[in-house]
Amino acid sequence: MKIALLQHTPDPEAAVALAARLCYASVGIDELREKLSASDVTAFLDKIMSLGHQSVLEHASFTFGIEGISRAASHQLVRHRIASYSQQSQRYVTFRGDGFPRVVPGSVSATEKRRQVFESAMQACADAYRALVDDGVPAEDARFVLPNAAETKIIVTMNARELIHFFGLRCCERAQWEIRALAVEMLRLVKGVAPTIFRDAGPGCLTGPCPEGGMTCGKAAEVKRLFREMSI
C-alpha cells in the first residue's frame, strides 16, 4: 500500500479560522486576514472545535494518491459519499501477462496451505481473464472474473470535516484491517499539515466512550495511547 498527500488547501488551518472568524465579525475579509496571527488561528480553531462548529472545516480539502489497495478496500472507501474519487478503470486498463497485481491478506499468507489455496484461485481468475481477452471479449466484460483481491489505484479528495468523520469510523479497531491501515496513514499525513484541526481525530473512543457499545474491542486505553503518540 502506498499513500501520498498530493495537495491540500494552502494553509488549511488559517483558511478554516478565517471562515469561522468571519461568521462573528462585522469587518471585511481583508481586515480579518491582516489581524489573524498564527496564535489567533490556533486559539480560534480550539474554540470552534470545542463548540462543534464543524461546517467551517469544509473550507479545507486534501487530495490523496493511493496505490496497492484491493478492490475490497476501495469498495469500502467509496461508500464515503462526501468526497471525490478517480479510480483506475478495469474497463479501459487491460491486465497483461499471466497474472494481475493483488493484495494478499495476512491471515492467508500465515500458512503455506492457505497461500497455495489463495494463489490457485488467483491464477484461475487470471487464466480465465486472459483466455477471454485473447478470444476477443472486451476488457469491460472479461473483468467480471477478477476478484476483490485485485489491486487498484485511486485519487481521493475529502474536506477536513468528512475526513474527521471518516477517521472516526475507519481508524476503529473494528474496521476491516486494510481500510483501517489506509485511514491511519491518511490521518498521519494530514496531522503533519493541520495538527490543530486533526488533533483529536481518530476512532470514536479518543474523545468519549466507545461508540461500538457491546461490540467494543475492549482496548480503548491502548488505542488512545497509540493515537496520542502517533508520529507525523
Swiss-Prot record:
Boundaries of every ThyX domain copy: 1-204
Keyword NADP attached: yes
EC number(s) from the headed UniProt entry: 2.1.1.148
Family annotation (Gene3D superfamilies): 3.30.1360.170
Its biological purpose: Catalyzes the reductive methylation of 2'-deoxyuridine-5'-monophosphate (dUMP) to 2'-deoxythymidine-5'-monophosphate (dTMP) while utilizing 5,10-methylenetetrahydrofolate (mTHF) as the methyl donor, and NADPH and FADH(2) as the reductant.
Top-level enzyme category: transferase
Binding site for FAD: S55, R79, H80, R81, Q87, N159, A160, R161, H165
Organism: Geobacter sulfurreducens (strain ATCC 51573 / DSM 12127 / PCA)
GO molecular function, one term: NADPH binding
Name assigned to this protein: Flavin-dependent thymidylate synthase
Cofactor note: Binds 4 FAD per tetramer. Each FAD binding site is formed by three monomers.
